[in-house]
């Protein structure tokens, strides 16, 4: 489920990236050309990461710095163009609409758990990783709120009309055509950074799962003798992302990604409740969630509510996928013995 969430998230981001390019150059809205761009995108990022983690990290660091600058400049300089009347809430969505919107919106907040894949290289991970995740989520939340506020304040009700590239339209209102171009490029770089970081980290989860015989695919644990990288896992992951991006749109992939990771979070939440019962046995140096059972129970309620907004065909699809994974899990030992 975690890998499905990551691959479908990459597919969603890839679609959003091409949508943004298409807002400037309509020719990129052609389906054949979109698929070709997906191929180049995933093949290039896969190749960079096969060559080595150093090259992959350099790309991630450079893109991370580059993508934040336009967003911060937009937030800082847009306040003078904000109209207070545009921030007034004139109508409240129904509970059903709010649930469907929240399921897609949740897509923007996932990914913090990726830091767990490198927890073995972090000093005192049981304490520092949870704190790091909390700080990063709060920081991202504040940035999202500021961006939404200035966007709504500048564009008002017309914001809903710009689904493909809204921030660039805001920048156009504030800075003129040069602002539109810079934010469009910045948004594309931001999405490219997301893809590059995912293709850097998630294949190593597949590699470890195969090596530990959690996945019945021995080939995923192969290491490239020249670059010392899990090349088969990287190729498999990049190929999966390309196929999902080619056959699904942004909204469809975002919902699949959100629902998949919510199911993972559901399991984690239930585990936290169980661990709370044995809290007295834990060492004092570990991070502890304050409030007793309050936070995990609230999380459980919210997750169930979000998942309840899935359509029937999506529920059936996830049910079939979970059944398939369960069968593979119970057969994996026999498969490994045959290999």
Locations of the language-model features?
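Transmembrane helix-loop junctions in multi-pass membrane proteins
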Residues: 14, 48-54, 83, 178-179, ...
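Alpha-helical transmembrane segments
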Residues: 217-223, 269-288, 336-338
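Helix-loop-helix junctions that connect adjacent transmembrane segments
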Residues: 28-33, 62-184
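Membrane-interface loop-to-helix entry segments
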Residues: 18, 32-81, 92-94, 133-136, ...
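Alpha-helical transmembrane segments of multipass membrane proteins
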Residues: 24, 43-47, 75, 148-150, ...
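TM-loop-TM module centered on a large, flexible mid-protein loop between adjacent transmembrane helices
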Residues: 19-27, 134-196, 215-252, 256-257
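A generic transmembrane alpha-helix motif of multi-pass inner-membrane proteins
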Residues: 74, 260-261, 274, 289-339
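Hydrophobic transmembrane alpha-helices that form the core helical bundles
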Residues: 1-42, 46-50, 55, 187-208, ...
């Amino acid at each position: 489920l975690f890998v499905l969430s990551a691959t479908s998230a990459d597919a969603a981001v890839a679609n959003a990236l091409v949508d943004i390019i298409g807002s400037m150059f309509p020719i990129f809205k052609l389906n054949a050309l979109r698929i070709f761009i997906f191929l180049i995108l995933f093949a290039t990022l896969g190749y960079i990461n096969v060559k080595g983690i150093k090259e992959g990290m350099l790309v991630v660091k450079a893109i991370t710095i580059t993508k934040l600058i336009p967003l911060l400049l937009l937030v800082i300089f847009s306040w003078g163009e904000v109209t207070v009347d545009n921030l007034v809430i004139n109508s409240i969505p129904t509970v059903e609409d709010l649930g469907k919107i929240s399921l897609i919106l949740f897509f923007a907040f996932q990914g913090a758990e990726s830091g767990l894949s490198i927890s073995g290289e972090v000093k005192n991970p049981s304490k520092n990783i949870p704190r790091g995740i909390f700080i990063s989520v709060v920081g991202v939340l504040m940035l999202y709120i500021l961006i939404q506020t200035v966007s709504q304040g500048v564009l008002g009700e017309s914001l809903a009309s710009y689904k493909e590239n809204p921030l660039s339209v805001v920048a156009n209102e504030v800075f003129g055509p040069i602002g539109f171009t810079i934010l469009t490029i910045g948004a594309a770089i931001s999405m490219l950074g997301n893809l590059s970081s995912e293709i850097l980290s998630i294949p190593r989860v597949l590699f470890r799962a195969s090596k530990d015989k959690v996945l019945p695919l021995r080939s995923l644990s192969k290491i490239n003798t020249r670059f010392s990288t899990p090349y088969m896992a990287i190729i498999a992951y990049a190929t999966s992302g390309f196929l999902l991006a080619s056959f699904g749109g942004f909204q469809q992939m975002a919902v699949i990604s959100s629902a998949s990771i919510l199911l993972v979070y559901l399991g984690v939440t239930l585990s936290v409740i169980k661990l709370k019962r044995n809290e007295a046995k834990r060492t004092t140096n570990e991070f502890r969630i304050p409030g007793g059972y309050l936070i995990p129970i609230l999380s459980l309620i919210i997750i169930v509510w979000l998942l309840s907004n899935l359509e029937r065909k999506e529920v059936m699809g996830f049910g079939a996928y979970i059944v398939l994974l369960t069968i593979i899990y119970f057969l994996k030992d026999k498969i490994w013995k045959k290999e």
